[in-house]
Amino acid sequence: MRGVVSGVRDYGNRMGIPTVNGAVYFDERYTGNPLVYCGTVGLIQKKHVEKAAKKGDLVVVAGGRTGRDGIHGATFSSGELDEKSEMVSSGAVQIGNAIEEKRLLDVQLAARDRGLYNAVTDCGAGGLSSAVGEMGETLGAEIELDKVPLKYQGLSYTEIWISEAQERMVFAVSPEKIKDFLAVFAAEDVEATVIGRFTGTGRLALLYGGRQVADLDMKFLHGGMPRVVRQAKLDRPVFRDFTVPAKDTYTADLLRVLAMPNVASKEWIVRQYDHEVQGGTILKPLVGPGRAGPGDAAVLAPLPASRRGVAVGCGCAPKFGDLDPYWMAASAIDEALRNVVAVGADPERTALLDNFSWGNTDKPDRLGALVRAAEACRDFALAFGAPFISGKDSLNNEYTAGGKNICIPHTLLISAMGIVPELIRATTSDAKSPGDAVFIVGVTADELGGSHYAELLDARGGTVPRVDKKLAPQIFKKLHGAILAGLTRACHDLCEGGLATAAAEMCIGGELGMELDAAKAPLLARSSMEDARVLFSESNTRFLVEVAPDKIARFEKWMAGMPFARLGTVTGGPDLVIRGNGGKEIVRAPWQDLKKAWQGTFKGW
């Protein structure tokens, strides 16, 4: 864990790219296959979007040199692991150099602005084989592998071709511009070398030492493999509810939920990452006067002169996948969207990305679960009008040790990016001022299945949270309008730990108390529910919203027709007080105690 954090820190900070949003999820089934997701978003002028290599263009590799590190990296990451993997596959791990990457990035942008290349791609999975193969798909290419700059001698032409060594880009440069292109790179001391050309023959020809070592038809290379057919087994889960013990108070339970690794503060990670570099981060990972409360999403201002910004958030709910992968995927999408909506993003101008990490899809039950999750992505992208613009997958995440096979949980990370129309309306989650009203928006259902409270009780089964395809987009749109109209002072989505945890996090961030009546929360198809289920259900599409007294009437009028209720007020005292059925006090704790529990889990890491 520390190695992952230091890797992201050292590379990201040195690149001068702010690390502004993230999440951490623990499950013992990740022990053999720990997952790390890193993503970057950038701004590009429209005139630079369309890029394509042309017949006669030269193939140029620039940046770091090629070595044996990263050989079969994609193959390694796509296969099942065992006790010997660390020793026999260590060469599959690339060795990064952030300074080299930063120099390459800067000079690439300079060359772009001067119009010195026609196309560019990175050397990712498969190295030069994928980069050149993809760029030359419709043209064909001839590559002289002995011209590729090497870190050291002794590499075979196969190793040169498939090495995934980092910090390398491949460019298509017209012969008329190659002199200027190479001069720009040389001026910044970034190595750039012509290794071939795009031919127009439709074939991929590889040369080494004066002889041809490969000759493939591009159509065969890209479309020659027959479509793979596998068997999928679609299990329809049967939900069996569990009993929740009735208690006089749930304060201790709330403190325990706040301390759970998947809920607790990740400040020890956040503080190591530079989220201020470039000076465009408006909303940061931690919010409130003491910068201790959790932010729902980051808001960036990439164009200093513009009133508009970009919100970046994410959603991930692996525990739900144990019960139903379809609703796990739907919940991840809903979470990512409500995170960006909570900070002021327009849900109708939001795009999604998916990252699937799964077990061995040769096994029918694993593939069946993947099919169900993919169906949910389709269904809810259409329901929300939010397109998937990119994505990635990593399959076969299974580990065999001592004769026991361990498969990771079905894992889908959804990232959301949305336009914030008015940066001045960007909203944080911390409670702001005593006397303000606190509203809940959305419907609470009896959905403790896969929840953190269920984990606390060591309870299996229950009903997994679902998403209402018709109602959820309406709630997002209405709430966004209220935020844009300046009717809200704080907004926080209800997620891990449910209503009680969200209220606690707002109190921690604002260093204020609250008095809430949980029994007033809108419920699904019933007039009352056990206190514990109202407090800790992780139903989707819900928010806690703080509204100033002089805007309560306007907010209520604006949200008319949506499920919402006024639960209580922000108080100047330290205590979070929550009342349940019959007006009985079921939670009381000062924000200092809540903060201590929330921050204590990883204190000293």
Please tell me what each predicted stretch does.
Residues 1-605:
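Glycine/proline-enriched, intrinsically flexible loops and inter-domain linkers
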